[in-house]
């Protein structure tokens, strides 16, 4: 939270007065100003408040459905990466201006920023992002599937790859089916295609596939 270092004379205002070339990065939960500035920020809280948990986990209504945090402290890690980039940019700017900067970096800012593609999906398609488990909103099939002895991941990024999947699965007719021939069609008919693929993948072991 903000303000903790000022009591020791280690805030940016005090230190930059001694060294105007100082590049100083403050990482807090909610930034240097605003109603939450003096609140502590934890990765778990930020994943919820920033929206990451709204798109992570199984869909509502399924067994195990509901909000789920990512398995690592992702917001903490990404904030560190954002900080390193910002510091390098400030150092480069100092080469031209001779002055340092105070970088105000909030966990919540980063948590929201990493959902930029979800915002783009909404602006483009008008659909509010939802939890989809391991599925992908814009690509089908792109998720986990059962095998005879476990699970595997299929990440089919284009129609050519889908045709090759159909051949490998012994189902060439899928690629000719108008419901599945293009990615746009597969998205529209996801509920019909995914059960068909699951039936086939479950017949062989992961190694066989």
Language model regions located:
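Aromatic-enriched alpha-helical interface/lid elements that frame and gate functional surfaces
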Residues: 140-209
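Active-site-adjacent "lid/gating" segments in soluble enzymes
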Residues: 6-152, 156-157, 163
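Short acidic, glycine-rich surface-loop motifs adjacent to enzyme active sites
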Residues: 1-4
């Amino acid at each position: 939270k903000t303000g903790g270092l000022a009591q020791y004379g280690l805030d940016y205002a005090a230190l930059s007065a001694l060294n105007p070339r100082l590049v100083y990065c403050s990482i807090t939960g909610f930034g240097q100003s605003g109603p939450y500035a003096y609140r502590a920020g934890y990765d778990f809280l930020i994943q919820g408040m920033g929206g990451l948990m709204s798109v992570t986990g199984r869909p509502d209504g399924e067994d195990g459905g509901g909000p789920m945090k990512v398995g690592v402290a992702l917001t903490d890690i990404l904030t560190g990466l954002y900080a390193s980039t910002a510091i390098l940019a400030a150092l480069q700017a100092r080469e031209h201006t001779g002055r340092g900067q105070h970088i105000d970096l909030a966990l919540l800012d980063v948590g929201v920023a990493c959902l930029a593609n979800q915002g783009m999906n909404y602006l483009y398609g008008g659909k509010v992002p939802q939890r989809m488990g391991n599925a992908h909103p814009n690509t089908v099939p792109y998720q986990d599937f059962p095998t005879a002895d476990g699970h595997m991941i299929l990440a089919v990024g284009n129609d050519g790859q889908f045709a090759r999947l159909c051949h490998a699965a012994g189902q060439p007719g899928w690629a000719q089916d108008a419901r599945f021939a293009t990615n746009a069609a597969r998205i529209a008919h996801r509920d019909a295609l995914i059960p068909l693929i699951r039936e086939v993948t479950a017949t062989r072991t992961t190694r066989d596939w």
